[in-house]
Each structure stands twice: as structure tokens, then as C-alpha cells.
């Protein structure tokens, strides 16, 4: 394996960690053990006296919102389970955040069922909006979408709307629901009532995680988060009409699933830099009326599955997407603690860019990547959802992994500390502020400092 900054750091602690980088994330730092390592991120994380968020020197955070606090709109309380998120330019230096709430039927703090914004009054998930003034202070907070279920991640569109993803396949009549679930919903942050609560049914009914839109061709890429066999699929949606703004995805289109010939399970790929041609196979029944999509018959060539497909983000002329982990004990073909893939739509290939091997130390950054976004330096910023310590970590264009933030709020029991996952990492339009959620207890942070 090529020498990387991560393996050099591991060597100093006696921990064996298999990780490597290649491709769009830049040249490998490769050489002998005497080679001078590159600068690592922004430096070590400093303990937070408030025990909320550990950051490097020079960075500071502001708590924007916490679950259970009153919504400024008076519509109820801030919902629980803060997840995927995006930041939009609201003009005159203002920022508008759209934030998912991954609420199941057991959620203690539902998204209030506001008239005109509610799909299924018996579903507790949805989205909220936060308006920030030029100083970064919250001036408004209100419901943008309600009556949806398990709103996990999503993705922004080139026309500045948010696609919110339901990570469930529950049908009407299940768990008290009165509507089918497992859809993508479009939220217009400029006017949520204009987008309403309309499922984009042609984009498929499955356990959606995230989406990314090709701004040049209009193709929408989608990940499916399934941790039980058969695992999830990576999809593309070809809109029936050119995408011209909010609501245009309602015109329908064609859904395909990724096939990598000869690779039925992406976990078997353990060599960063490995590249494969891909095929796109029409999904027999996108509505999953009788059979979930991942169980459907894709013909003699089959289809390619991956355990826990998570974050998905457009950048570098293609789509970065994540497999959070793979476990042979759960049916995967091989073990890993995270993969980051890159799909090049022009060359019609996928390439493994980052691999966190099965020996990854759960107390170090790089265990079970989840939500991702592009960082100001052109690399990736990644949320963890693993065991042990929970980090937001960066992957630089030069291939370094570095800790950017660590969750310092202990939500465990006495003698059994536990830290909640991070979710929804995104940056302000000017790249000067990072926004991120601590999923539990449900805190939204704004992080400022010497970004580069």
C-alpha cells in the first residue's frame, strides 16, 4: 500500500489502519518512511470547555438551534434528529439553511404538521428552515416540509432548491401512515408553499439517502441506504424534460440502476485507484408496487449492490458517493469501514478513491463515512456515523485525512460514554462558514475560522 499521511500517523500509535487515496482527490503522498509528510489539515483539536464541539485553534462555533427549543415561527418546537442540510444565498449577505429531520414514528419531537406543507399527517419527519443575518444570527426558523418519514439526507439542485430523501419503504397502512413513503420531495427555500409536499414518484420508491444533480446534463444520481441483504443500489434518473427550475422534476423520467459487469458487490474492491466501466440498467418497477427495487430482476447480468450507500455530492465533473461500511457477517462480500467512489459520467466509469480498511481505529477520524460535501480547499468534508468518537473529517485534494471537529457532548450513561453522529455538513455560499448537525441531541452548529 502506498504511504499516506493517515498510515504515517497510525504507525506512530502502533495502530494498523488500511487507507489510501487516489484519483480526483489528488496525487498520493507516496514514498519512504523518511519522506516529510504534508501539513495535516488545521492542526489538533482542542477540548471545548463547554463540552459540545472540539475544534482546531482559531476556529469557533455558534449554536444556531437545538431540538426542543421553540420555533421562532410559533409553529411548535424544533424537531429532533437533525440530519441532511444545505445552505442557500438569501441575498444581502444572508444565508438560508434547509435542514432535514429523520423522524420515525417513535420520534419525541415531530415536525409540526403545517397546513399546505404536510404530505401525511401521521408521519413525523420533514424539513425546517433557518434564516441567518450577515452576522450569522438566526432571525427566523420555521417548517418547510412536514408529514414525511425518515428524512435522511438529500441534495441541492442547480436552481437552488433542496431535494429531501425519505429513507424508508413503508406503505400506507404501516405504522399508522395514510400515504406510501420512500420518495424524494423538493423544497423551495425561497417559498416552501410553492413546492408544497409533492412526492417525486418517478425517481423511485426505496430507502433514499442522498442525491446529486449533474448541472450540465440534468441527470440526478441517487443512493440507497440498505444494510440488510440484498444491499442498496446506485441510481441515475433521466428527467423526461429539461430541468428549468422548481417543480420541473415532477414531469417524470426514467430510473436506472448501476451495473458494474463482473462486480455484484462493491465491497470486493479493496484497491484504491481501481476503475471499472459501468452500465445503466432500467429499473423494472420504480414504484416498487410489488417488490422492492433491490430485489427486482435485472436480467442475466444482474445488478451491483453495496452495503450502506450514503452521501452523494457533485464535484470535479462527476459524483462522489459513499459506502459507509461493509461487513461479511451481515452478508457483504468483503469487510471495510468506508469507501468513497467517484463516477465519471463522460467516461462512464466508477473509481474507488478512498478506502478505510477493516482495521480502522474507531477513535480516529475515518470510521463509517456518511454525509459529504465539497470543502473550500477543493477536497471533501465528511461526517462520521460510526462507533467510538465521532468526527467531521476532511480529505484534502492532496489525499490527507484530518480531523475538523469532534463531538464532545456525551449522550451516554455514567461509565458508558457515547457521542452522537454528525450529519448535514455544508458550507455557506462564500465558503467562510461550515454548518453541521449533531444528530443527537439535535444541535445545529455554525463553525467559522481560517478556512482555506
Residue ranges of predicted features:
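Conserved blade-ending motifs and adjacent loop-strand segments that build the rim/top face
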Residues: 356-370, 400-427
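Blade-level signature of beta-propeller repeat domains, shared across WD40, Kelch, NHL, RCC1
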Residues: 426-452
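N-terminal secretory signal peptides and thylakoid transit peptides that target proteins
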Residues: 1-19
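Loop/turn-rich, solvent-exposed surfaces of beta-rich toroidal or solenoidal domains
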Residues: 323-325, 362-400
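Beta-propeller blade signature
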Residues: 124-132, 179-190, 235-239, 338-344, ...
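Residue-level detector of Asp-centered blade-edge/turn motifs that repeat once per structural unit
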Residues: 89-92, 157-158, 215-216, 314-316, ...
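Beta-propeller domains
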Residues: 266-350
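C-terminal segment of N-terminal export signals and the immediately downstream linker at the start
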Residues: 23-57, 61
Amino acid at each position: 500500500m502506498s504511504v499516506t499521511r493517515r498510515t504515517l500517523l497510525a504507525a506512530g500509535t502502533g495502530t494498523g489502519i488500511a487507507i489510501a487515496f487516489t484519483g480526483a482527490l489528488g496525487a498520493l503522498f507516496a514514498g519512504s518512511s523518511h519522506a516529510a509528510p504534508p501539513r495535516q489539515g488545521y492542526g489538533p483539536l482542542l477540548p471545548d470547555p463547554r463540552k459540545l464541539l472540539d475544534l482546531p485553534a482559531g476556529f469557533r462555533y455558534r449554536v444556531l438551534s437545538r431540538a426542543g427549543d421553540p420555533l421562532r415561527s410559533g409553529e411548535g418546537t424544533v424537531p429532533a434528529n437533525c440530519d441532511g442540510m444545505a445552505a442557500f444565498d438569501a441575498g444581502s449577505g444572508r444565508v438560508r439553511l434547509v435542514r432535514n429531520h429523520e423522524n420515525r414514528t417513535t420520534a419525541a419531537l415531530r415536525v409540526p404538521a403545517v397546513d399546505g406543507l404536510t404530505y401525511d399527517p401521521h408521519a413525523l419527519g420533514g424539513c425546517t428552515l433557518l434564516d441567518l443575518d450577515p452576522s450569522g444570527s438566526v432571525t427566523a426558523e420555521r417548517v418547510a416540509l412536514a408529514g414525511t418519514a425518515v428524512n435522511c439526507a438529500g441534495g441541492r439542485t442547480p436552481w437552488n432548491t433542496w431535494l429531501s430523501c425519505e429513507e424508508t419503504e413503508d406503505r400506507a397502512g404501516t405504522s399508522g401512515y395514510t400515504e406510501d413513503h420512500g420518495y424524494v420531495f423538493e423544497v423551495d427555500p425561497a417559498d416552501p408553499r410553492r413546492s408544497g409536499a409533492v412526492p417525486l414518484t418517478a425517481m423511485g420508491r426505496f430507502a433514499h439517502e442522498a442525491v446529486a444533480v449533474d448541472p450540465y446534463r440534468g441527470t440526478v444520481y441517487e443512493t440507497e441506504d440498505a444494510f440488510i441483504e440484498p444491499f442498496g443500489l446506485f441510481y441515475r434518473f433521466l428527467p423526461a424534460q429539461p430541468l428549468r427550475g422548481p417543480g420541473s422534476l415532477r414531469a417524470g423520467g426514467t430510473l436506472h440502476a448501476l451495473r458494474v459487469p463482473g462486480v455484484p458487490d462493491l465491497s470486493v474492491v479493496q484497491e484504491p485507484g481501481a476503475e471499472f466501466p459501468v452500465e445503466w440498467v432500467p429499473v423494472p418497477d420504480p414504484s416498487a408496487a410489488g417488490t422492492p427495487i433491490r430485489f427486482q430482476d435485472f436480467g442475466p447480468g444482474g445488478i451491483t449492490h453495496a452495503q450502506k450507500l450514503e452521501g452523494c455530492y457533485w464535484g470535479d465533473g462527476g459524483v462522489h458517493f459513499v459506502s459507509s461500511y461493509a461487513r461479511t457477517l451481515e452478508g457483504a462480500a468483503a469487510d471495510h469501514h468506508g469507501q468513497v467512489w467517484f463516477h465519471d459520467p463522460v467516461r462512464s466509469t466508477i473509481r474507488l478513491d478512498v478506502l478505510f480498511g477493516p482495521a480502522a481505529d474507531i477513535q480516529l477520524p475515518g470510521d463509517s463515512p456518511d454525509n459529504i460535501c465539497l470543502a473550500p480547499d477543493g477536497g471533501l468534508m465528511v461526517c462520521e456515523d460510526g462507533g467510538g468518537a465521532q468526527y467531521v473529517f476532511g480529505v484534502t485534494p492532496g489525499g490527507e485525512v484530518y480531523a475538523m471537529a469532534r463531538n464532545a457532548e456525551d449522550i451516554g450513561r455514567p461509565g458508558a460514554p457515547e457521542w452522537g453522529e454528525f450529519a448535514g455538513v455544508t458550507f455557506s455560499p462564500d465558503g467562510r462558514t461550515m454548518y453541521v448537525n449533531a444528530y443527537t441531541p439535535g444541535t445545529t452548529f455554525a463553525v467559522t475560522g481560517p478556512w482555506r
